[in-house]
């Protein structure tokens, strides 16, 4: 499978894009991830960005069977991106707002929210080495729960290996830190009340975001287990594909750069924005 993408529509207008990503990919979650991939293929055979965690909740992902499975996904046309290192955030929140963000918005998994620059640099480097050892190309880094704190942001900007990162609402083109509005449809399935709430919210957000240049669908390992949730995002995926071109995040960034060079469509973003989801 290869992404069939173009920078502009036949009418000469900017192409509208859809980027589908699968978060939290690791040996412990891989069986559930495969179910999500199967559910995506029920709708369409599109390229995904798989967000890989090197040591998910402390469990090393450098396992031959898992690495072979991920290499097969790469060969099938999917992109691999680094997604944190441990995917856990054991640090104590600094205040009530920080507690809400790191313990309620996400269940203690915002690993890169409170790291110092040195800590973040070390984890980014270790993750990059694991990718290199497997011969996996690496263009992007996405912080767990999209929570990228000030120290992690500085570490990311200081390394020249990254082409993009993303928050909950933006795609950030690196190293310049150009920001692109990129609404993300994503589901929370941790509890019974979150599932129907997510379904309603994403239905509304998909309508609001119809005119956006890029729409993202951020899936997680358990998003195929609840039939109502699965059918919700499958319908939204099908609807989006009727007027958007599917591409990996790296391919979108490449196409965006090519177009922005021709048309001067670049905007800068303040580093402060990157500490927010």
Language-model features: where?
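Alpha-helical scaffolding within the catalytic cores
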Residues: 3-5, 32-36, 62-70, 166-176, ...
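Catalytic grooves of carbohydrate-active enzymes
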Residues: 19-33, 134, 186-252
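Metal-dependent polysaccharide deacetylase catalytic core of the NodB/CE4 family, i.e.
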Residues: 51-150, 217
């Amino acid at each position: 499978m290869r992404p069939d993408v173009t920078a502009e529509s036949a009418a000469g207008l900017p192409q509208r894009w859809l980027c589908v990503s699968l978060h939290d990919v690791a040996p412990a979650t891989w069986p559930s991830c495969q179910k999500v991939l199967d559910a995506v293929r029920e709708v369409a055979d599109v390229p995904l960005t798989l967000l890989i965690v090197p040591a998910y909740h402390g469990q090393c992902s450098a396992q031959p069977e898992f690495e072979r499975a991920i290499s097969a996904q790469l060969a099938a046309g999917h992109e691999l991106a680094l997604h944190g290192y441990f995917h856990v955030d054991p640090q104590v929140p600094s205040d009530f707002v920080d507690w809400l963000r790191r313990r309620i918005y996400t269940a203690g998994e915002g690993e890169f929210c409170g790291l110092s620059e040195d800590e973040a640099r070390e984890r980014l480097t270790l993750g990059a080495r694991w990718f290199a050892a497997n011969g996996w190309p690496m263009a992007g880094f996405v912080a767990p729960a999209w929570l990228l704190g000030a120290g992690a942001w500085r570490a990311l900007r200081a390394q020249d290996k990254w082409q993009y990162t993303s928050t909950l609402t933006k795609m950030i083109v690196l190293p310049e830190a150009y920001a692109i509005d990129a609404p993300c449809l994503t589901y929370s399935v941790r509890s019974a009340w979150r599932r129907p709430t997510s379904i309603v919210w994403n239905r509304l957000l998909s309508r609001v975001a119809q005119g956006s240049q890029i729409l993202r669908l951020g899936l997680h390992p358990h998003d195929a287990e609840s039939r109502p949730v699965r059918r919700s995002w499958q319908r939204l995926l099908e609807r989006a594909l009727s007027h958007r071109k599917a591409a990996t995040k790296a391919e979108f960034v490449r196409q965006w750069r090519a177009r922005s060079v021709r048309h001067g469509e670049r905007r800068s973003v303040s580093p402060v924005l990157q500490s927010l989801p």
